[in-house]
Amino acid sequence: MGSKGAYRYHWQSHNVKHSGVDDMVLLSKITESSIVENLKKRYMDDYIFTYIGSVLISVNPFKQMPYFGEKEVEMYQGAAQYENPPHIYALADSMYRNMIIDRENQCVIISGESGAGKTVAAKYIMSYVSRVSGGGPKVQHVKDIILQSNPLLEAFGNAKTVRNNNSSRFGKYFEIQFSPGGEPDGGKISNFLLEKSRVVMRNPGERSFHIFYQLIEGASPEQKQSLGITSMDYYYYLSLSGSYKVDDIDDKRDFQETLHAMNVIGIFSEEQTLVLQIVAGILHLGNISFKEVGNYAAVESEEFLAFPAYLLGINQDRLKEKLTSRQMDSKWGGKSESIHVTLNVEQACYTRDALAKALHARVFDFLVDSINKAMEKDHEEYNIGVLDIYGFEIFQKNGFEQFCINFVNEKLQQIFIELTLKAEQEEYVQEGIRWTPIEYFNNKIVCDLIESKVNPPGIMSILDDVCATMHAVGEGADQTLLQKLQMQIGSHEHFNSWNQGFIIHHYAGKVSYDMDGFCERNRDVLFMDLIELMQSSELPFIKSLFPENLQADKKGRPTTAGSKIKKQANDLVSTLMKCTPHYIRCIKPNETKKPKDWEESRVKHQVEYLGLKENIRVRRAGYAYRRVFQKFLQRYAILTKATWPVWRGDEKQGVLHLLQSVNMDSDQFQLGRSKVFIKAPESLFLLEEMRERKYDGYARVIQKTWRKFVARKKYVQMREEASDLLLNKKERRRNSINRNFIGDYIGMEERPELQQFVGKREKIDFADTVTKYDRRFKGVKRDLLLTPKCLYLIGREKVKQGPDKGVVKEVLKRRIEVERILSVSLSTMQDDIFILHEQEYDSLLESVFKTEFLSLLAKRYEEKTQKQLPLKFSNTLELKLKKENWGPWSAGGSRQVQFHQGFGDLAILKPSNKVLQVSIGPGLPKNSRPTRRNTVTSRGYPGGTKNNYPMRAAPAPPGCHQNGVIRNQFVPPPHAFGNQRSNQKSLYTSMARPPLPRQQSTGSDRLSQTPESLDFLKVPDQGVAGVRRQTSSRPPPAGGRPKPQPKPKPQVPQCKALYAYDAQDTDELSFNANDIIDIIKEDPSGWWTGRLRGKQGLFPNNYVTKI
């Protein structure tokens, strides 16, 4: 019985199940219902990301998803959007690359309601940018601060609400600053409207800020003793809402993360202790209660004064005095006098709460300031901004804080509308682009209702006016505000009032605000008495948190909380408008916070108010990309010689020349007055792909030239270092002691089937096909790869079942981390056999390039372990076998390899039971060293004398390897030994093991540079239009006359390539199977001179046949 779920594929594999559409621009029907249905399909299949053009839609999965690891970072780094499934890494990579290439600041605006996943999205962006950007220790320090700022600010600024277990109760705009090279070398955080009232009051079922619970759960016994920490229900402020624990939050572990974050950011341990003292002091402050004595407030139990006074470094009596009374200044007849006013119980509670809120807010500002100082740089160059701000929220009772939060979200929605709907359509008109307008709701009318100054004044202006005229009056101010609102804006279509407050018709729906406390919270005044109290602290750190000049601050009207948030919101909008914006629209699928729970009506509501339908319609009817002519030319100039390095003519004509050079259909773009507009993303991807290929081609040329320069410069040094490993310990081969080191003997660049086993960015130091001997001493071929981290042995096996049954595929046989190698054993003779010793079992290998391999392995081993690689030389070697649980050779065991003096330069292997007998003739003395006279000079000639042939054998064609010994098909004739050069060549042919040629080839690097190979990069959906363009743009050949007869066979001798060959040096030819090569000169060494595609060079004659 077959199982439906038997085959489980990775979400990004080519055979992955498709779920809905990746980009909702491709939806066949554009309705809210079809959008919701597509999102639901993808969400249920764990696809949380979907595109609308370049806008990313993210649905909160309420669980950890598996696709945020190193594999995905490598997959999305440098990739075009269409290459991989939708992902937040694709957006982050686009921001990073555009910043570097276009030299423009970028920002991402993450919006959505509370609990939709905005904070997590921001973390993923910051984490991705940190992982893909380079840099040294200083840059790494900045990266650490960027990443560690998250847990620190979350501890002091996030809390559990009824809608979100980790809700941001503040907004932040995080600018990551970069050097011109793309390394993060600085940063800056701007924070907005911390909801400090949460310290003293909150809705039932919610918590205060995480740090209070972290301290109680995670403090050490000594800290608990010194800070007076006990159970959570002991503290009045925490017991208000009756919620202490959260299912998916570990307060004890998070406390350690918070302390670690403070260490990374550079907050001294003394300051950390004082920060925790203040946190504990706030909790103890809340336990001070008041009773009424003769209409005035008195502290109910004075013993509760002692601990907060001690923790805050203030006098206990002074604390009592400032909580129950206040100094008021009054002016009468030009004279000023202070009046001592005793407070009632309600006023005393308000004063206590005001001090607690102020302490938490000042500590939070200190932490933000500490982070900014740790990342500060002298001057700004480029930056990526990440906006993570509290989401739109509606509670049972919505007060002043919700009013401000929803106002900021209203402003963010206005930015989105301005830049994606309104501005885009207006731009088409300004640029003279053919366009059909699309209707949409512009929420500017709601923003004006809240923030307008005049005609009519907005809610915030009326609120400030009431606070100014009734600044000395506490009672009745809120009702006066409601009356003024009803009188001045009561007829506004987006405003309604009720007996205890008012309603605003926000873009996300109607919200009812309770007027209670509106004016008091808007005033946000910290009484001078409390500032004086904290300035009297014996602790300099606490004093520094209250730097006010009391005499100067008495003059002028204090700034209200509403005007502050309005200014901050408008400053934020100005900052965002200066950047190239990117958007993430977060959707909350349910209120249960459980995975796979889908509330259709809730999601549909969000889809409607986020304007996704209109966004799809504008994107579908409009142009995916627009750019100023000059910027477009600057980015794509490299595509043609006429535009590179600079276009001399009219910019518009230059843009047209570039688009025509890539054969882009005229209906895929329009040229406006100052910008180019490209319709389909595929057309843009075509340009990007060709640009990347151009840069890649030039980079390869530079890289190749540089590598050759470095290789030649270090050639002698490398050979001598390698030779030192074997000096006085092992005989050397005559024909390999002076040879060049190439490293890659199997052409890894053209071997994706081997590259799959190695990390994408892992450098391959050495690659060769070696012989590996098993427990019966039977030799099999293995590809040996060495990287800075690991050693790989790769074999081949036939697939035994499935659709690929019978196909031979590469299989990873062994992977050994470099530091796990115990030692390497070799004989003292000139053979090529060595044993890799590892804890589990050993590997017996044979490679003609053993000296080069061992020298590279020794370097990597020393880098990893700071020790020398143990090399053992003996003519009797022990081999530990792998344990197996079947067959006659089970239970592991060991084998022995014995070496004897024989004849000739080829090793003769004779297995006998558990011993392998190896005999070989004498080689060069053990004290032999490389000589400089045979080294390759800068022109590639031995000893400075011109020689047109490589210093190695012509490679053997496929199928010429038998039992680990190479049998060359080419045998030089006897007269070839007559001159020294040919004699030397023949010795190499009989001795050295060349690279293993491939049966099939994807083509050499040369072919990728020819114009023909660019045909496949055309826009995929051109179809008939492409054919029409080709037929209309050029006349029929020779006016339609019949082709002439082909030319007679040339007199120059030619040969046909039997196999593909990749050049190993600059004077060699690369060719593919079936290429026709002109033969210029034949040589008995096996290396002929020929000409192919205008290039003359050497090639191995056993790879071709004459025609």
UniProtKB/Swiss-Prot annotation:
InterPro entries assigned to the protein according to its UniProt record, in alphabetical order: Ie/If_SH3 (IPR035507), Kinesin_motor_dom_sf (IPR036961), Myosin_head_motor_dom-like (IPR001609), Myosin_TH1 (IPR010926), MYSc_Myo1 (IPR036072), P-loop_NTPase (IPR027417), SH3-like_dom_sf (IPR036028), SH3_domain (IPR001452)
Modification Phosphoserine, positions: S1001
Domain IQ span(s) in chain numbering: 695-724
Annotated segments matching region Disordered: 919-1052
Residues that coordinate or bind ATP: G112, E113, S114, G115, A116, G117, K118, T119
Pfam family, one: Myosin_TH1
Actin-binding: region residues: 581-591
Biased composition annotated in UniProt, kind: Polar residues: 979-989, 998-1012
Any single GO CC term annotated in Swiss-Prot or TrEMBL for this entry: myosin complex
Phenotype upon gene inactivation: No visible phenotype at birth. Mice exhibit massive proteinuria, combined with the presence of leukocytes and hemoglobin in the urine. They develop enlarged kidneys, present damage to the glomeruli, renal inflammation and fibrosis. In the glomeruli, the thickness of the basement membrane is increased, and podocytes fail to develop normal foot processes.
Residue span, TH1 domain: 730-922
Intrachain disulfide bonds: none
GO biological process: endocytosis; glomerular basement membrane development; glomerular filtration; hemopoiesis; in utero embryonic development; kidney development; platelet-derived growth factor receptor signaling pathway; podocyte development
Tissue specificity as recorded in UniProt: Detected in kidney glomeruli (at protein level). Detected in utricle.
Domain SH3: 1050-1107
Origin superkingdom: Eukaryota
Domain Myosin motor stretches: 19-692
Keyword tags: Actin-binding, ATP-binding, Calmodulin-binding, Cell junction, Cytoplasm, Cytoplasmic vesicle, Cytoskeleton, Lipid-binding, Motor protein, Myosin, Nucleotide-binding, Phosphoprotein, SH3 domain
Compositional bias ranges of the Pro residues kind: 1034-1051
Family: Belongs to the TRAFAC class myosin-kinesin ATPase superfamily. Myosin family.
Purpose of the protein: Myosins are actin-based motor molecules with ATPase activity. Unconventional myosins serve in intracellular movements. Their highly divergent tails bind to membranous compartments, which are then moved relative to actin filaments. Binds to membranes containing anionic phospholipids via its tail domain. Involved in clathrin-mediated endocytosis and intracellular movement of clathrin-coated vesicles. Required for normal morphology of the glomerular basement membrane, normal development of foot processes by kidney podocytes and normal kidney function.
Stored PANTHER family: MYOSIN (PTHR13140), UNCONVENTIONAL MYOSIN-IE (PTHR13140:SF341)
Name of the protein described by the UniProt record: Unconventional myosin-Ie
Organism of derivation: Mus musculus
Gene: Myo1e
